[in-house]
């Protein structure tokens, strides 16, 4: 339903795709390339928030989290690279990572572990394809209200940290809640930064434990 609503508002191509399935990704990217002639920028945004004590989490759940939060990005990025290499006109990969990749939260390991792997995946693409003019960067955001971090998840994370939901959402150095618009601006900045690759931009209101160099 949401896809239909989006399609009615913008002149865009909306496709159903299981990003954890290589064949599904391949079909979708083939249609994209045929429709627009190629791909200039990939914003890889897939993810599911899965919590649990890491020593006790069900193995099936942990493996599914890696499918959702790591391999989905690898599937999309690898198909994008194939298209970009054929185009031979440079390109840009952008990954929605998470502050969990460098600053894990209590009982949130099933989500944080694949995000840590995703951060390194982002850097690996920068190393492997920089010579082709293909940039790879990421955004480490934190506590953004979305379909992923919904009211129920916010209450759960606030309880784990023994704070109120308002304190949880403003729990940063600036004491300001970070919004989706702030993250969008970060992605745009990286998309147009032609001399930047292998970088991870934090958008979290300030969290020294999650800060990078």
Model features per residue range: what roles?
Residues 77, 114, 122:
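Active-site helix of classical SDR
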Residues 82, 127-131:
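Alpha-helical segment proximal to the catalytic Tyr-Lys
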């Amino acid at each position: 339903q949401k896809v239909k609503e989006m399609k009615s508002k913008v002149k865009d191509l909306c496709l159903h795709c299981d990003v954890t399935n290589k064949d599904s990704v391949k079909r979708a990217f083939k249609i994209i390339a045929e429709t627009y002639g190629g791909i200039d920028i990939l914003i890889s945004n897939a993810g599911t928030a899965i919590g649990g004590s890491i020593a006790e989490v069900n193995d099936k759940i942990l493996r599914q989290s890696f499918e959702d939060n790591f391999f989905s990005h690898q599937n999309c990025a690898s198909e994008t690279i194939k298209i970009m290499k054929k185009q031979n006109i440079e390109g840009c990969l952008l990954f929605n990572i998470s502050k969990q990749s460098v600053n894990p939260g209590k009982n949130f390991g099933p989500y944080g572990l694949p995000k840590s792997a995703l951060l390194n995946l982002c850097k690996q693409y920068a190393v492997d394809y920089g010579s082709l003019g293909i940039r790879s960067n990421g955004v480490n955001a934190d506590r953004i209200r979305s379909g992923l971090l919904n009211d129920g998840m916010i209450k759960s994370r606030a309880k784990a940290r023994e704070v109120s939901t308002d304190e949880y959402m403003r729990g940063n150095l600036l004491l300001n809640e970070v919004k989706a618009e702030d993250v969008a601006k970060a992605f745009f900045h990286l998309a147009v930064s032609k001399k930047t690759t292998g970088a991870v931009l934090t958008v979290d209101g300030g969290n020294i434990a999650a800060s990078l160099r």
